[in-house]
Amino acid sequence: MSIKDGHTEKLIRDTAMRIFFKEGRFHATTQDIADAAGVNRTLVHYYFRSRDILFKQVFEEGRTAFFKKLDEMVQPEQSFRVKIEHLIDIWMEQGIEYPFLDTYLVSQLNNPSVLEELTENRVDNEDRKAAFYKEIKAEMKAGSITKMEPMQFLLNLAAMVSYPIIMRPLLERALSIDEKDFNKIVAGRKEAILKTIFLK
């Protein structure tokens, strides 16, 4: 085989993404992925060489797509409330589609090499970030949201959005609910968060 098939490569990548981050099977083997994709294990090695390389690629792909959406969220022509609504939507959609992506990320935060990999390709737009902080302060001054440091506001927002997703297995067991019920709860989080954040 000398010519790579883009369709097959995408099939393997999408299958790996589902197994690793939708099903939470972080230790799945190339044989597991091949079986789920309906291809020979040799093809998985042909396209990605190893299970670890495939894992790293699909994780990076998911992370990059998430940050790209966040960058689009802070476009200046949108109102502050719309930006926050979009941020919640983006986070919730990813959390429902790939519930174990954030879980894996949190589990690796004490690994210096992983932290370096997470940040080395992430070039923040300082001007855009500063403008967003300025918007937060303006909303506080207008009385739309509670006054605090902008970073505290963002931390509160991140916690309210991500906590249920990261704690999903525990919450499902503690509340005696299934995946369908949990997704309904998550779907209602947006309105609950907006009511908590905005004073008017």
Model-derived segments and spans:
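N-terminal intrinsically disordered/low-complexity leader segments
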Residues: 1-7, 18
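Helix-turn-helix
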Residues: 11, 15, 19-53, 57
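Short, basic, alpha-helical segments at the C-terminal edge of helix-turn-helix-like DNA-binding modules
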Residues: 60-65
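Hydrophobic alpha-helical connector segments
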Residues: 72-100, 150-154
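All-alpha amphipathic helical-bundle segments outside canonical DNA-binding/catalytic cores
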Residues: 82, 120-123, 140-158
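Short alpha-helical scaffolding segments that buttress acidic/His motifs in well-ordered protein cores
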Residues: 88-91, 104-109, 157, 161, ...
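Short secondary-structure transition hinges
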Residues: 92-131, 152, 178-184
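C-terminal peripheral helix-coil segments that are non-catalytic and often amphipathic
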Residues: 130-142, 160-200
